[in-house]
Amino acid sequence: MPLCGSSSSSKHPIERKIVILGDGACGKTSLLNVFTRGYFPKVYEPTVFENYIHDIFVDNQHITLSLWDTAGQEEFDRLRSLSYSDTHTIMLCFSVDSRDSLENVKNKWVSEIADHCEGVKLVLVALKCDLRSSDEYGNESAITPGSIQNQKYNGGGGNGLIPYDEGLAMAKQIGALRYLECSAKMNRGVNEAFTEAARCALTATPKGARDSAPEAESSSCTIM
C-alpha cells in the first residue's frame, strides 16, 4: 500500500530506448563504455551488437535507459535494421577526425533512419573532441563550446579536424534537436550527451516497427 502523498507509479522508472548510430570506429562503443562502466577501452574491438541498461535521473525523473550499440559497417546493415523497433531517440555520432563519418551523417544515416524509424528524435554527437586540443606533448585543454568555436577551419583545417561550427551546421541541416560534443577518452561531455538524449526521449513517442501516429516535433537545434 503506497504511503500518503506517494503513488505506486513513482516506484517504477520510466523506460526509454536510445539507439547509437554512426560509422564504424567513430567512437560509439567507447562513449557507451565510459558512460555505463566508467572506463575507456584501450584496444578497438568492432561491435556487432550490444545492449546496455543504465539508470539516470533527468529533471527529477528516474529513467532506465536501454542503450543499443550498433555496428556501422556496411556488412551489418541488415542486422542493424533490427535495432530500430520502438526507439525513442537516436544519438547519431561522427568523429571529428573523420570527414567521411560526418558526410555519412547526411549521405547514409539520415536516409537509413527515414527508412526504418521515420520521425524519431535525433541528437547529433561529435566524438573524439580531445583531438582538437591535443598539443605536441599530449596535454589536453578543456573542451568547451567557446574554445571550439574559436578554432577556424581553413580548407582541411590547420589540423584536419572538423570544427564545432561545421558540426552545428550539420545538426541544423538534418533537423537534430541537440548538437553536443564530447571526449570519451577524457570523460568530458559524456554524461551531458546522454542526459540531453534522455531529456529528448522523455517526451518522445516510440518509433520504428510498431510506431504510433506521427507526433508534432520542433526541428530547431539546441546548442550545448
From Swiss-Prot:
Q: Which residues bind GTP?
A: 22-29, 69-73, 127-130
Q: Where is this motif: Effector region?
A: 44-52
Q: Which Pfam families match?
A: Ras
Coiled-coil ranges (or none): none
> How is this protein named in the record?
GTP-binding protein RHO3
Modified positions (Cysteine methyl ester) in chain numbering: 221
Share an example GO biological-process annotation for this protein. Answer: microtubule cytoskeleton organization
Nucleotide-binding: present as a keyword of the record? Answer: yes
Main localization of the protein? membrane
Query: What does UniProt give as GO cellular component?
Result: cell division site; cellular bud; cytosol; plasma membrane
**Keywords on this record?**
Cell membrane, GTP-binding, Lipoprotein, Membrane, Methylation, Nucleotide-binding, Prenylation
Q: What does this protein do?
A: Involved in the regulation of actin polarization. Rho proteins are required for distinct steps during polarized hyphal growth of A.gossypii.
